[in-house]
């Protein structure tokens, strides 16, 4: 575990992203299991190893996923695996069975639908305030999008905070909305957050590219990769995977593997990878990770009242963490306690752009 409050986080800081990453791998395991239809004794050694590896990895993921308590990951894994299994169906056999047992399948379908409804209700009541909180965040994000249809240059936090403050100032809100309201860093819906940050038009264009890659992948029968991408798309509907470098890299690789990489050419992909590497994005992510670790040490000084020492530590971290609202609030408050009021005001004023915490 990478967090003292959670028993299971993998290499992440929270069980949610860890579960989402596992849910993205599960359909690939299922694909490699299903893609070899021959009987076991007729398989060559390499295919046997592939099938065993996919089976073991898939079973281990199925053992871990429930313990993460991530409903978003459960849904993403279920939808993507059902899609992969459906794409491997024998169409001729399915048509014969449908004509022969049509009424029975309709009854089974109705029963499965009722079970899914009960499962959805169970997942809601598992953590009801969490589910209501996300619904409220989506509502506020939609109101912010209506106010900024072409995107908000100040970022998600500033636009969300403004929309939420106006909503509560009107007085027309429910008691549960007041209870679950907070100051989130993310919208827990990558589509809404992207539309708010970059505009509705850019969001539609991005979705057009993604579904174009999926279409190419399906035409090329790359169902495992497409299933993983579908899992990521479903998980993005109620979480924040694109704020984590691991998901960004995985998402780009999946888009290229769907077939767009064959279309645009391997040399162009190599050039893009070199640009990303030369641009220092990997180094930037590493520096930010190290800065966050040092921030935890500086926070000890801040909370113990050693503000001068904390200021020196915060000053070194400022170039790497100047876009994090919580860090700016702490730094500004520490400067205020040290009597450096002008610097404190500048720091807190900048924090308003990156945090909606009142």
Predicted regions and their residues:
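Interfacial juxtamembrane loops and adjacent helix segments
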Residues: 2-6, 143, 154-196
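Helix-start (N-cap) detector for alpha-helical repeat units in TPR-like alpha-solenoids
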Residues: 291, 325-326, 358
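Alpha-helical transmembrane segments of multi-pass inner-membrane proteins
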Residues: 1-6, 10-95, 108-121, 196-225, ...
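Hydrophobic alpha-helical transmembrane segments in integral membrane proteins
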Residues: 121-135, 274-304
């Amino acid at each position: 575990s990478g967090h003292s409050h959670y028993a299971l986080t993998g290499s992440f800081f929270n069980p949610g992203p860890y579960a989402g990453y596992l849910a993205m791998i599960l359909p690939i395991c299922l694909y490699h299991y299903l893609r070899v239809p021959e009987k076991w004794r007729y398989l060559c050694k390499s295919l046997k190893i592939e099938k065993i590896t996919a089976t073991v990895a898939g079973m281990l993921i199925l053992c871990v996923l429930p313990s993460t308590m991530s409903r978003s990951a459960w849904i993403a894994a279920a939808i993507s695996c059902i899609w992969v299994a459906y794409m491997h169906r024998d169409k001729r056999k399915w048509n014969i069975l449908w004509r022969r047992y049509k009424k029975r399948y309709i009854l089974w379908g109705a029963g499965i639908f009722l079970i899914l409804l009960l499962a959805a209700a169970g997942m809601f009541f598992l953590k009801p305030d969490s589910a209501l909180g996300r619904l409220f965040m989506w509502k506020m994000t939609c109101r912010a999008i209506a106010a900024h249809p072409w995107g908000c240059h100040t970022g998600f936090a500033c636009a969300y905070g403004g929309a939420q403050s106006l909503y509560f100032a009107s007085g027309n809100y429910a008691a549960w909305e007041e209870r679950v309201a907070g100051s989130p860093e993310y919208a827990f819906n990558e589509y809404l957050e992207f539309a708010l940050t970059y505009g509705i038009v850019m969001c539609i264009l991005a979705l057009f590219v993604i579904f174009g890659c999926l279409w190419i992948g399906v035409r090329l029968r790359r169902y495992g990769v497409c299933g993983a991408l579908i899992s990521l798309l479903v998980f993005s509907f109620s979480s924040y995977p694109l704020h984590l470098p691991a998901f960004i890299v995985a998402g780009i690789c999946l888009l290229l593997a769907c077939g767009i990489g064959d279309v645009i050419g391997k040399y162009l992909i190599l050039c893009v990878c070199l640009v990303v590497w030369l641009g220092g994005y990997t180094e930037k992510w590493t520096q930010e990770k190290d800065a966050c670790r040092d921030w935890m040490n500086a926070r000890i000084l801040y909370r113990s009242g050693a503000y001068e020492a904390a200021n020196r530590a915060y000053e070194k971290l400022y170039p790497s963490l100047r876009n994090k609202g919580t860090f700016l609030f702490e730094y500004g408050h520490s400067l205020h306690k040290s009597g450096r009021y002008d610097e404190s005001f500048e720091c807190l004023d900048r924090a308003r752009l990156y945090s909606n915490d009142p």
